[in-house]
């Protein structure tokens, strides 16, 4: 919506009506306003009028960094931290087959939501790949494990002599291509209809 005082009052009135109808109390003090291309003084005045906090881009929504530009590496470090926390010391004592199962079933599946939504920088993909390799090859007492096979070979399907480990870079590209497929085929999805109706009518 536009940075307009009157529209803001209408929005607050709608939210208050929703609160009265559903008995769900809205806590405006815990809400945040994220202005885009709005002067700081105007944004601050609107936030005071609405009774909420004034946020800034990028912000986190459902764990994803949301902003008007491509996320930087520092914005995606929480994903790396999350995967490293799952790389517990107990995995060092597992047999090699169990480590492979751990990599395929848990470590490689953690970033799927990010891979579906964002084009991850190569720096982040390399760090995630490092965590996969550590989980698979590192043994107790070692800071880093010595790879017993080249990583591209490990990422091949098992029927082609590989270990079936998910290549996160290729997975990222494949998951993002589904949006292009939906757009090209004019899928019955709100965002597809909006773009086609707005720019390609």
Residue ranges: model-predicted function:
Residues 1-201:
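Nucleotidyl polymerases of mobile genetic elements and RNA viruses
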């Amino acid at each position: 919506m536009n940075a307009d005082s009157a529209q803001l009052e209408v929005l607050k009135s709608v939210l208050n009506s929703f609160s009265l109808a559903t008995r769900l109390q809205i806590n405006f003090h815990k809400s945040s306003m994220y202005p885009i291309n709005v002067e700081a003084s105007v944004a601050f005045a609107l936030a005071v009028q609405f009774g909420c906090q004034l946020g800034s881009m990028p912000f986190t929504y459902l764990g994803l960094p949301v902003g008007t530009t491509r996320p930087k590496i520092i914005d995606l470090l929480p994903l790396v931290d999350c995967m490293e926390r799952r790389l517990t010391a107990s995995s060092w004592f597992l047999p090699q087959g169990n480590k492979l199962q751990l990599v395929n079933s848990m470590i490689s599946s953690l970033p799927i939501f990010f891979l579906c939504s964002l084009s991850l920088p190569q720096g982040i993909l390399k760090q995630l790949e490092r965590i996969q390799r550590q989980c698979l090859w590192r043994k107790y007492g070692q800071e880093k494990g010595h790879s017993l096979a080249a990583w591209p070979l490990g990422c091949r399907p098992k029927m082609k002599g590989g270990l079936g480990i998910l290549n996160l870079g290729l997975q990222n590209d494949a998951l993002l291509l589904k949006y292009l497929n939906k757009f090209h085929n004019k899928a019955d999805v709100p965002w597809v209809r909006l773009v086609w109706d707005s720019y390609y009518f």
